[in-house]
């Protein structure tokens, strides 16, 4: 069975931070790890944010982006984001009670839902929404 990894798991996989050990365990246990083209854009945004905020150096960012590109090419299945995913994400945002679901997370959820695969996330709001919307989820506290 495949699992869809959101960006909250991928960032600590490639940057040394609090969730790094858990991210390594999650990716190691999953023989079929999926992401979307949305995830690729979000990863790029997160790395740029870390660099602009002075959280990491240019060298660290370059290394992380290179390792991520290698992982995408050799290990991850990258799926397209469809118009129906955006429509479904809008519905998920509207139907998820407080604290709600942010649009980027709703899009990840819609993609996992479309494929009927497990969501792997470290985002607790997204993990809660998975349960509400019938998507199996693995998360870390």
Label the predicted regions.
Residues 35, 80, 103, 120-121:
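Short beta-strand scaffold positions
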Residues 37-40, 69-97:
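Acidic catalytic patch
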Residues 1-41, 50-66, 132, 138:
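Short, well-structured N-terminal submotif of metal-dependent ribonuclease cores
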Residues 2, 85, 109, 113-141:
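Acidic, PIN/NYN-like endoribonuclease modules and their adjacent C-terminal/linker elements
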Residues 7, 83, 104-106, 123:
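Conserved glycosyltransferase catalytic-site signature
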Residues 45-52, 114:
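Short glycine/serine- and small hydrophobic-enriched flexible loop segments
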């Amino acid at each position: 069975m495949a699992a869809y990894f959101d960006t909250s798991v991928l960032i600590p996989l490639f940057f040394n931070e609090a969730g790094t050990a858990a991210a390594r365990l999650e990716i190691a246990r999953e023989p079929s790890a999926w992401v979307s083209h949305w995830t690729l854009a979000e990863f790029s945004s997160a790395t740029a944010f870390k660099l602009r905020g002075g959280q990491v150096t240019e060298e660290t960012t370059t290394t992380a982006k290179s390792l991520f590109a290698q992982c995408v090419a050799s290990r991850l299945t990258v799926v397209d984001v469809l118009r129906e995913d955006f429509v479904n994400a809008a519905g998920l945002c509207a139907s998820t009670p407080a604290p709600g679901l942010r649009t980027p997370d709703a899009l990840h959820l819609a993609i996992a839902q479309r494929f009927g695969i497990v969501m792997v996330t470290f985002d607790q709001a997204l993990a809660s929404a998975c349960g509400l919307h019938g998507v199996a989820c693995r998360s870390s506290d």
